[in-house]
Amino acid sequence: MEVQEFCENMEEIEDENYDEEKSARTSDENRKQNHSEIEKRRRDKMNTYINELSSMIPMCFAMQRKLDKLTVLRMAVQHLRGIRGSGSLHPFNGSDYRPSFLSDQELKMIILQASEGFLFVVGCDRGRILYVSDSVSSVLNSTQADLLGQSWFDVLHPKDIGKVKEQLSSLEQCPRERLIDAKTMLPVKTDVPQSLCRLCPGARRSFFCRMKLRTASNNQIKEESDTSSSSRSSTKRKSRLTTGHKYRVIQCTGYLKSWTPIKDEDQDADSDEQTTNLSCLVAIGRIPPNVRNSTVPASLDNHPNIRHVLFISRHSGEGKFLFIDQRATLVIGFLPQEILGTSFYEYFHNEDIAALMESHKMVMQVPEKVTTQVYRFRCKDNSYIQLQSEWRAFKNPWTSEIDYIIAKNSVFL
């Protein structure tokens, strides 16, 4: 009996030890699992911060490939050192940007007087004019009360609305990450959180557009009608000039700005829409300076000195404009969207077409660049300006056909 009782007691002790060991193993596994979950959350949070940091650093944003964490931190340190060396925390938000002896109002007046333009703020979500300085009256003949709260798209020329919407868009501010699936070796579409697709303060914008000009009886400034075209006769243009809207070419220079703090990702999804709406374009609008200071003489016997005003254009093999630099607006008066799709022969002087046709034929046959003679190019006000161009044809290596012609145009005054 005693032996049997002893064996039973030993079995009970072994069962208790087994249960203790099992519970100990279970607790260890739970601790490891909890530790793994904590580490995963920590890594996810770190990756989120690294992605946010890379979206704010211009050097990281310019890279096409996905950067590792150490590279992002290194570029962030370099960017902060550069900002510290510039003397302000931010080129637009720094508190030391304004001299201490000037008030904000005085600084604004000095900037507007120096630029001979007007300051305006437009919301990027709906194009609403949030602010406009009173100096707009000297440029557009409209008062501050006329434009404040109105839609900017109602003031713009209809053909310029699409271009302006591109300038208000902030989609290019999203991180450019190209991930490759290790199994299929195909690019993987990554859903970037909308909170990361915000505006980086200081994203610069510079473009030309046409704004509606309020007519006045004593208006002596140069105007243009939205119904005028180079292909219409002067009779139709004169008859419609009094009835159509008047527009003025405005050069807009500024930057995109977001004035609200970025919300955390764990907040409600409906708050993302409010975050994207709180962004705006802060810009100064002014009349672009006229490069031309004299009219072109009837003959080109005496060649003037070259003026280093260059603009680039790209043409099809037939001579149609596929692209033109914005600097051309300062020279010829046409906006890029007005001249694209038209042939450059429409703007050449009749007496220069024969020589330019020979240059056109030559550039289609030789791989070297071809320099044209000094020729006359028709501007928007129907006057002529002297240009000289270097044409070079780009041939597709696969089809041996000419894809386009690159032109470097120099202004002669």
Swiss-Prot record:
GO terms for cellular component: aryl hydrocarbon receptor complex; cytoplasm; nucleoplasm; nucleus; transcription regulator complex. The keyword Thylakoid does not apply. PANTHER family: CIRCADIAN PROTEIN CLOCK/ARNT/BMAL/PAS. Disruption phenotype: Cyc mutants don't display PER and TIM cycling, and are completely arrhythmic. Keywords: Biological rhythms, DNA-binding, Nucleus, Repeat, Transcription, Transcription regulation. GO terms for molecular function: DNA binding; DNA-binding transcription factor activity, RNA polymerase II-specific; protein heterodimerization activity; RNA polymerase II cis-regulatory region sequence-specific DNA binding. This is Protein cycle. Disulfide bonds: none annotated. Putative transcription factor involved in the generation of biological rhythms. Activates cycling transcription of Period (PER) and Timeless (TIM) by binding to the E-box (5'-CACGTG-3') present in their promoters. Efficient DNA binding requires dimerization with another bHLH protein. Forms a heterodimer with Clock in order to activate PER and TIM transcription. The record marks 35, 38-39, 43 as: Interaction with E-box DNA. Residues 1-43, 219-242 are annotated as: Disordered. The gene is cyc. The keyword ATP-binding does not apply. Residues 8-19 have a biased composition (Acidic residues). Residues 30-83 form the bHLH domain. Residues 20-41 have a biased composition (Basic and acidic residues). Its main location: nucleus. It holds the Pfam family PAS. InterPro entries: bHLH_dom, Circadian_TF, HLH_DNA-bd_sf, Nuc_translocat, PAS, PAS-like_dom_sf, PAS_fold.
